[in-house]
């Protein structure tokens, strides 16, 4: 499961910083569970705001 791209702009993240963080990525079932949980809540949050936006237009 992949999170939607929520970063504000491409120049916001320094590629050197991203490479450093990539080396610290946790591995294992708990990391996968955490990743899926974060993706779930990001998706739910986006759907909630889309619903609010749609209800404000009606």
Curated annotation (Swiss-Prot):
This is Uncharacterized protein ORF58. GO terms for cellular component: chloroplast. It comes from Porphyra purpurea (Red seaweed). It is found in: Plastid, Chloroplast. It comes from the Eukaryota. Keywords: Chloroplast, Plastid.
């Amino acid at each position: 499961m992949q999170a939607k791209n929520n970063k504000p702009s491409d120049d916001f993240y320094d590629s050197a910083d991203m490479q450093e963080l990539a080396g610290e990525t946790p591995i294992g079932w708990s990391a996968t569970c955490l990743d899926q949980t974060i993706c779930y809540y990001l998706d739910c949050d986006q759907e909630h705001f889309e619903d609010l936006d749609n209800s404000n237009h009606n």
